[in-house]
Amino acid sequence: MRVSDFRFDLPESLIAHYPHPQRSGCRLLSLEGKTGNLSHGVFTDVLDKLNAGDLLVFNNTRVIPARIYGRKASGGKIEVLVERMLDEHRVLAHVRASKSPKEGASLILGEDESVQATMIARHDTLFEIRFDDERDVLTILNSIGHMPLPPYIDRPDERSDKELYQTVYNERPGAVAAPTAGLHFDEPLLEALRNKGVEMAFVTLHVGAGTFQPVRVDNIEEHTMHSEYAEVPQEVVDAVLACKARGNRVIAVGTTSVRSLESAAKAAKDALIAPFFDDTQIFIYPGYQYQIIDALITNFHLPESTLIMLVSAFAGYKNTMNAYNVAVEQKYRFFSYGDAMFITRNPLAINEKVGEE
């Protein structure tokens, strides 16, 4: 299975740089996994696609203003992208600079140069940085940090992104990228779903910058996934098991919810799913046997990305690539601020050969 099997041609003009003016007003491409049939609509159509007793699983992570600009005390500009908060004063971060800071180097951060920091140690590609400030990490980031827009949104972050690049139900700070399928849900839609009898549960997966890293091997089985922290608490496990027992569907809102639930299923010893509080490197690609998910709400993903592979494993490779080609023809908007898909599971996807006509 080659990375190039997941390539498709995407005009630059279809990459969304701003979200739809109304969260739930984006377009929705629906893909029926069993048949490959496609239908076009708007996001609020999910209300008609869900039944009373179905379970929606959301990721309640909150995007932190993780990008900081500054300089080394010795001179030279730096850009810090926080990957993970270690405690109240230390972070793991990506650092861009003409010359990487050495251990013990002093950093002066913020456009107003209000924060002193020290590079403590290097861990492979990440730098451990300590903020030499009595304030905690989150307070500092909220003061001097910028929203970490994805690399394909080619513009500076704006004040509005602090609201628009967050789900309305975010709770747990720690992500450096939004769980973007959730961006389309506004309070009126959530209320309408509750009134219909749709159940809701919340996992946490702190999305890392690794989500944007390209697959750097030709044979995808050789790819090593980046690590992200996920939590699937007991109440989510109970909700999933109750949903299955009554014959309803579990619908994941976004690939991060998929990866959280499937990680919890993989780690369960003698049960379908068990509580999970750990890092996950789960890599889902065609041939994977899904355990939990019956339907998926997700945005359109990058060509050759691990996320289009995840979707292909769920809906079937041919169905997925056909849907993406139709989406391009129909000028759907792509990536984080773009349009969405509603996909039902293709039970035959696991046996499908990838790349074969």
Swiss-Prot record:
Highest taxon of source: Bacteria
Q: What is the annotated localization of this protein? A: Cytoplasm
Query: Could you tell me the keywords of this UniProt record?
Result: Cytoplasm, Queuosine biosynthesis, S-adenosyl-L-methionine, Transferase
**Quick check: keyword S-adenosyl-L-methionine in the entry?**
yes
* InterPro entries recorded: QueA, QueA_dom1, QueA_dom2, QueA_sf
**Quick one: which pathway?**
tRNA modification; tRNA-queuosine biosynthesis
Q: Name one Pfam family in it.
A: Queuosine_synth
Query: What is the catalytic activity of this protein?
Result: 7-aminomethyl-7-carbaguanosine(34) in tRNA + S-adenosyl-L-methionine = epoxyqueuosine(34) in tRNA + adenine + L-methionine + 2 H(+)
Q: What is its EC number?
A: 2.4.99.17
Q: Name one GO biological process term.
A: tRNA wobble guanine modification
Q: One GO term of the cellular component aspect?
A: cytoplasm
Q: Does the keyword Transferase apply?
A: yes
Q: Which GO terms describe its molecular function?
A: S-adenosylmethionine:tRNA ribosyltransferase-isomerase activity
Q: Quote the NCBIfam families the UniProt record gives.
A: PRK00147.1, queA
What is the protein's quaternary organization? Answer: Monomer.
Query: What is the role of this chain?
Result: Transfers and isomerizes the ribose moiety from AdoMet to the 7-aminomethyl group of 7-deazaguanine (preQ1-tRNA) to give epoxyqueuosine (oQ-tRNA).
Descriptive protein name: S-adenosylmethionine:tRNA ribosyltransferase-isomerase
Species of provenance = Proteus mirabilis (strain HI4320)
- Gene encoding it? queA
